[in-house]
């Protein structure tokens, strides 16, 4: 997976022990998490922080991009943040977390999704992408995860 990311232009930063590059038009840092040489998580972290109003726009734009992509199915309806939401207050005072999640249903999209068996639907639920807002001293950034629970440790080494 790391070689595939390098082929897409990502470069290794030895100081951070992460890959760096551009994803969806934004500079990001990437970590790849494996278990028994199988990738079960790819984590992308925005390299640049932004203001509260900018992060709302970025978060909502990502929600719309995933909702409009036939390869993904939203985990719940309307995951966008309202314009009136005071993110800084909610995160600081109420420890609120802003997250959006989508199932990866494959290149065939939702049309054949309805024809899937229960077993196939269970497999779809094990491949998700989700993102959240991180905070660093009043500046915000997106952390995005691509998870494949099929490759995650489930206690088999215990």
Task: Tell where the protein language model's regions lie, with residue ranges.
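Start-of-domain marker
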Residues: 1-27
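Non-cytosolic coordination micro-motifs
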Residues: 2-12, 48-158
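A generic structural signal for beta-strand entry/edge sites
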Residues: 16-18, 37-39, 137-141
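Mid-chain, structured segments of secreted extracytoplasmic proteins
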Residues: 23-65
């Amino acid at each position: 997976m790391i070689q595939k990311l390098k082929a897409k232009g990502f470069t290794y930063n030895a100081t951070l022990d992460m890959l760096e590059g551009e994803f969806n038009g934004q500079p990001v840092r990437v970590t790849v998490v494996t278990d028994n040489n199988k990738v079960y998580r790819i984590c992308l972290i925005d390299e640049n922080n932004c203001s509260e109003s900018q992060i709302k726009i970025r978060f909502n734009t990502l929600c719309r991009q995933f909702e409009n992509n036939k390869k993904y199915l939203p985990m719940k309806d309307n995951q966008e943040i309202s314009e009136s939401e005071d993110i800084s207050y909610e995160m600081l005072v109420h420890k609120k977390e802003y997250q959006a999640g989508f199932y990866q249903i494959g290149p065939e999209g939702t049309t054949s999704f309805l024809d899937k068996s229960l077993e196939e639907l269970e497999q779809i639920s094990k491949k998700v992408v989700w993102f959240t807002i991180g905070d660093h001293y009043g500046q915000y950034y997106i952390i995005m995860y691509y998870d494949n629970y099929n490759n995650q440790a489930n206690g088999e080494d215990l």
